[in-house]
A protein has these predicted regions:
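A compositional/structural signature for long, glycine/proline-rich flexible linkers
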Residues: 2-972
Length: 972
């Protein structure tokens, strides 16, 4: 790289905030990251991409767990013969030989798998059962039975497949699923401890058949699953991703949100595409599965979520936080509770999460630790005291589970449980109950004893069926479990294989020691030690910080634009117009130097705002999350004739006549329009905009206030978001100012995990601030790698060229097959400003504009301001109107500051030298080549740069690639 020691200050240089640049070296947990003036070196790029893939895979493991869990359920059921016409029923209850997440031992489980690929299915349900249907992604479809629309009377349910459009017959409870595969769960109830009556009733009345066979429905078969050893628990190794891929391939894209599909697509899991990770990616997925698995265990067994703890001074937790089966609170997805739920349980229903009236439904409390905060040890003996008047109208139960598999603990007892139905249960005189856990029963306590196994950790769940008010008002609370120190522990060596033991697949358990990119992780029979918990939570916070930056960069970018505009004057009253064009003194993401820009900030908090658009301009309005709202001008509904646009704020009711009406999802909007030069002169465009552009509140339409036009040309101001910790403060302002539903729950949930949540102060402690500061730099570095050294093959115009696109995928929402193209979004918003379909879609030849970017020379090396280069544009440059070449600073992505006012050349430039064959050679370097000054753009020694070639009115030879720009060649 060139030396910066001899560089003098360019004439156009302005003060650049350090917060928008990145140092030449940043020390991080990934190792030292090195840059040449904002351009990452090869080793840095490798580290950043390895980290990006690893962290995305960890995030995918935690996010896609419901899909993997339901896929494992399907495979387990199909292994014992379950199909559309055959269901499994546990006639003598479910015992510990079946690997099933935290099932109870008091219900008659009937489970099936509904395949809707051939059309709708009818499910005729028995009376007095409690059931549900969930889709392949763990989303609730409907409740059945006592909590369903049949209210426990039995009924006919019609389940429709995705996109079903045929006539729906009458006489059914109709529900639509977003997936073809659906899990059916029905639970019957014992009568005086006997399951037989419920089994007979279910077998006599449960029917599943295609709606097309309503006249003569086929017989429904039943497989007795009691005592059967089969697995329904998802894998936790790299095969997890293969499992999720099968779900993605089989199900429609509408089944899950675009962000989740985009996350999976970034790992190679994309609908219609083969999942074939190479050796590097396979190793990354293996490490990510291990860390994701470890993180899920930390979330489940040592939760940081205070609301999960049912009582202030005890160790009981609830799986559902916020009272929502969708894990939503004020529009925010609760990410950790969702992971904890699907890691330890199956079945998602509002009846499980909502606060039902007293004595209705059931309530759950799970404990992983004794009163000292120590994990339960299968070789030790414990006592649980349930105080008098246990608040269960129907009955209560306690079931013990294995910390490795989260299924019932396998012991010599068929059922590792106790309930109030248990014959011989000892009840104290005051109606309290003492329950004992240990490898051997205490003398006289066997009736109240649940066996544990030395060398095995365990946890238990207390269930209250028909919970009473004293549970909800917390006047009744179970005691914490206490170890009985007087009882001698039993060592694992003395233990024998339990009578009910079953082989757990290695893919569902975790080793005692794992080497990972975040260090050595240690476990004791599935329980992470303190050091491991600290490591996975630090990594989780760090990766969420990085992902938050990459995901919310559009919002931070708009925030910076607002601050820049407001430095000239208030919103709704001020237009920044570049009367002498936009030069390099203004810090603005990749503007051109051939248009008259006019910018304004629109604030809808006090009501609708009108924009009267000038004729013959090209404008766009984007919201505060940088999403497209409207085209204004030539690409808008006024077709360049000028028009009155009315922008309505969120929740606004009533639409007045006489306007082109647009609905906004945010109160803050950014408006940008461009006028066009006439024979190289900006004056006509400036006069046109000043004469016709009006912005005013609808309430003042009868007497609009005067609009202030501020000349931005030659002014030094910043519209570029921060790259350090202050990035998070910028995004927090957006979250606080805008409605809670302005952005999707997943994004809000991601931000909430790092402390950014509407209505709450963003006040990270010292630990979190340090993590986020590092995450901000790593995210900024990652955005630079994605932009300057992109891996997206479709970003390049051809495999042998450095020229690439700013919009990848041809969609302004960065969508492909329902999946968000995460890297494409990052590339655009790190590098450019202004979202509109007009920039992304292919227009007819001769219409609109096209862009080509280059960040490296013909040898793949970063463009160095101390060296000399040449760009050859072959004959017949395909631009009906004109073309231009503009240089930008790698640090700021704004115009390169040199001695030249405009770091650009265009076909409109007076004196441009055109070769005899109509080709053009353009030169770049710190000094003009002899005889080529008219075709020279200056660069600065020690500064990196990049270039955009713009074609206005692009012709067909551009689209069919019979014309291509030359590569940038180093000369001299």
């Amino acid at each position: 790289m060139s030396s910066i020691g001899t560089r003098t200050k360019p004439r156009m240089a302005t003060a650049i905030p350090a917060s928008i640049t990145i140092p030449n070296r940043v020390d991080t947990r990934l190792g030292p990251l090195r840059f040449f003036d904002g351009f990452p070196d090869e080793e840095t790029v490798r580290r950043l991409y390895d980290n990006l893939d690893f962290q995305r895979a960890v995030q995918a493991f935690l996010t896609a767990m419901p899909a993997a869990s339901l896929a494992a359920m399907r495979e387990g059921l199909q292994s014992i013969g379950v199909s559309n016409t055959t269901v499994a029923i546990f006639e003598t209850l479910m015992d510990s030989r079946s690997l099933f997440l935290t099932a109870n031992t008091e219900s008659i489980y009937t489970v099936g798998w509904l395949d809707l690929r051939e059309g709708p299915l009818v499910v005729e349900t028995p009376p007095n059962v409690l059931g549900l249907i969930d889709d392949c992604w763990g989303h609730h479809v409907c409740d059945i039975g006592n909590a369903g629309p049949d209210a426990g009377e039995g009924g006919k349910f019609l389940v429709l497949p995705p996109a079903y459009r045929d006539e729906v017959p009458a006489g059914y409870h109709v529900f639509r699923s977003n997936t073809y595969g659906n899990w059916l769960l029905i639970r019957g109830f014992m009568v005086d401890g006997d399951p037989a009556p419920a089994v007979r009733r279910i077998k006599a009345t449960l029917r599943i058949y295609p709606v097309a066979h309503t006249g003569r429905p086929p017989h429904t078969h039943f497989v007795n699953a009691s005592g059967r050893s089969f697995n329904t628990i998802h894998p936790t190794d790299a095969t997890f991703f293969e499992t999720v891929n099968r779900v993605v391939q089989e199900e429609p894209a509408i089944a899950i949100d675009a962000e989740t599909l985009g996350l999976l697509a970034s790992l190679g899991i994309e609908k219609g595409q083969p999942f074939a990770p190479d050796a590097r990616m396979t190793q990354i997925l293996q490490h990510a599965a291990a860390v994701g698995h470890a993180t899920a265990r930390a979330m489940s067994y040592q939760s940081r979520i205070r609301e999960q703890y049912l009582f202030d001074d005890r160790h009981y937790i609830t799986r559902f936080v916020g009272g929502s089966h969708e894990f939503l609170r004020d529009g925010v997805r609760l990410l950790d509770p969702r992971t904890g739920m699907f890691f330890c349980a199956t079945g998602n229903s509002p009846a499980m999460s909502a606060r039902l009236p007293a004595s209705v439904g059931s309530q759950y409390a799970t404990a992983y630790m004794d009163h000292k905060g120590c994990a339960f040890d299968g070789g030790r003996t414990y006592r649980l005291h349930l105080p008098p008047n246990i608040p269960a109208r129907d009955f209560w139960s306690i079931v013990v589970y294995d910390t490795q598999t989260r299924s019932m603990l396998t012991t010599d007892q068929q059922f590792p449980s106790i309930s109030s139905h248990r014959p011989g249960l000892a009840i104290n005189r005051d109606t309290s109950v003492d329950v004992y856990f240990g490898p051997k029963p205490l003398r006289g306590k066997k009736s109240n004893w649940i066996q544990t196994i030395p060398g095995k950790h365990w946890f238990f769940m207390l269930r209250l069926y028909g919970p009473l008010e004293s549970w909800f008002d917390k006047t009744w609370q179970p005691e914490d479990v206490e170890e009985l120190p007087e009882v001698e522990p039993v060592e694992p060596e003395a233990a024998t294989l339990p009578r009910m033991s079953t082989l757990a697949p290695s893919a569902v358990v975790i080793a005692d020691r794992i080497e990972t990119p975040i260090g050595t992780l240690r476990f004791s029979d599935g329980l992470p030690d303190e050091g491991t918990v600290e490591k996975v939570y630090d990594n989780l916070d760090f990766q969420r910080g990085v992902q938050s930056v990459l995901t919310t960069m559009p919002a931070a970018a708009m925030h910076a634009v607002r601050e820049g505009i407001r430095s000239f004057g208030p919103a709704n009253e001020t237009v920044v117009i570049f009367e002498n064009l936009l030069d390099s003194k203004s810090l603005f993401l990749t503007p051109n130097t051939e248009s008259v820009y006019a910018l304004a900030w629109i604030d809808l908090r006090n009501g609708p705002v009108v924009i009267e658009s000038p004729p013959d301009t090209l404008g766009v309005v984007d919201d505060f999350w940088f999403r497209y709202v409207a085209d204004v001008g030539n690409a808008g509904p006024d077709r360049g004739q000028g028009g009155k646009y009315l922008f309505l704020p969120p929740y606004y009711a009533g639409v007045p006549d006489g306007y082109l009406v647009l609905y906004a999802r945010t109160f803050n909007l950014g408006f940008m329009t461009r006028g066009f030069l006439v024979n190289g002169d900006p004056t006509p465009a400036v006069e046109n905009i000043k004469q016709h552009l009006r912005i005013y509140p609808l309430s003042k339409a009868d007497n609009p206030p005067v609009l202030t036009f501020a000349n931005g040309s030659g002014r030094s101001f910043n519209t570029i978001h921060s790259s350090d910790f202050t990035f998070f403060a910028e995004v927090n302002e957006v979250v606080q100012e805008e409605p809670g539903d302005a952005i999707d729950p997943e994004t809000l949930g991601l931000l909430a995990t790092i402390g950014i949540e509407k209505g709450k102060p963003f006040a990270p402690d010292e630990r979190m601030k340090n993590i986020l500061s590092e995450a901000a730099y790593v995210a900024n570095a990652t955005a630079r790698a994605i932009t300057y050294r992109t891996r997206m093959k479709e970003a390049y115009f051809s495999p042998d060229s450095a020229w690439k696109k700013v919009f990848v995928g041809g969609n302004h929402e960065f969508l492909r097959n329902g999946a968000r193209m995460l890297d494409a979004r990052t590339l655009f918003h790190f590098y450019a400003t202004g979202i509109t379909p007009a920039m992304a879609v292919k227009m007819p030849a001769g219409v609109g504009s096209q862009y080509a970017l280059a960040f490296v020379d013909a040898q793949g090396q970063p463009l160095d301001g101390g060296k000399h280069y040449r760009l050859h544009l072959p004959p017949n440059i395909p631009a009906k109107d004109f073309w231009s070449v503009v240089l930008y600073d790698n640090q700021t992505r704004s115009e390169l500051q040199t001695d030249q006012q405009f770091p650009s050349i265009s076909s409109q430039k007076a004196g441009l030298v055109v070769n005899p064959d109509q080709s053009v050679d353009i030169y770049f370097g710190p000094k003009a080549p002899r005889g080529a000054a008219r075709n020279w753009i200056q660069t600065c020694s020690g500064k990196g740069w990049n270039v955009i070639l713009r074609l206005y009115g692009p012709l067909q030879s551009w689209f069919d690639q019979t014309w291509r720009p030359g590569e940038i060649e180093q000369v001299g």
